């Protein structure tokens, strides 16, 4: 919902696309930007198939569109093996990848990141400075160290295993009762 509110503030014309078992269903209408959550679509939980990801990339190239890939909550996909990020297949620089470390670590952390063209990152940093003057650099440095040491990957494996077990127990209980 926060993303939609941001787009509305920019006076964007939002056109929702349907989602099926393979992810976003594209039409031929031109679009300037696509905002997608291919790793774990909210609220359906569907992960976008590899075929549909390729179609989206081709569609964006054909219509000169930009894709904003929000990897929000992809760590909560416990039923499928995750596919690589859409950004990993981006050969044209059309995908802006954004994600957060808050879901898997701590909701209060409020630390996210973006993978995009360096010029866009510079612009985003300038905008962030206008909105949020002094982000907590100590937390950023500690998280960079945590990531560099491989601790985040270890934590994610444990988080995924524990959460998948909880999800399985809840799913079984709901089906039983």
Where in this protein do the model-derived segments appear?
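Active-site pre-lysine segment of PLP-dependent enzymes
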Residues: 28-30, 41, 46-66, 73-104
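PLP-dependent aminotransferase class I/II
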Residues: 96-176
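Alpha-helical structural signal in soluble globular domains
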Residues: 6-10, 55, 59, 85-89, ...
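PLP-dependent aminotransferase-like
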Residues: 1-47
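Short, glycine/charged-enriched secondary-structure capping and boundary segments
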Residues: 7-11, 48-51, 81-83, 111-113, ...
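Residues that form or flank phosphate/diphosphate-binding pockets in enzymes
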Residues: 2, 51, 107
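A generic "structured core" feature
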Residues: 1-12, 31, 66-67, 77, ...
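Structural motif
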Residues: 32-37, 68, 113-115
């Amino acid at each position: 919902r926060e993303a939609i509110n941001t787009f509305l503030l920019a006076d964007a014309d939002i056109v929702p696309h349907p989602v099926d078992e393979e992810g976003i269903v594209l039409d031929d209408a031109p679009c300037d930007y696509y905002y997608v959550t291919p790793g774990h679509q909210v609220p359906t939980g569907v992960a976008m198939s590899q075929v549909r990801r390729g179609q989206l990339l081709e569609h964006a190239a054909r219509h000169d569109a930009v894709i904003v890939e929000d990897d929000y909550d992809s760590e909560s996909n416990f039923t499928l093996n995750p596919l690589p990020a859409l950004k990993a297949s981006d050969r044209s620089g059309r995908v802006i990848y954004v994600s957060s470390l808050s879901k898997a670590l701590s909701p209060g952390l409020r630390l996210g990141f973006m993978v995009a063209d360096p010029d866009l990152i510079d612009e985003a940093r300038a905008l962030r400075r206008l909105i949020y003057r002094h982000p907590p650099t100590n937390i950023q440095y500690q998280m960079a160290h945590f990531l560099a040491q491989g601790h985040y990957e270890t934590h994610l494996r444990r988080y995924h295993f524990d959460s998948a077990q909880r999800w399985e127990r809840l799913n079984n209980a709901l089906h039983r009762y």
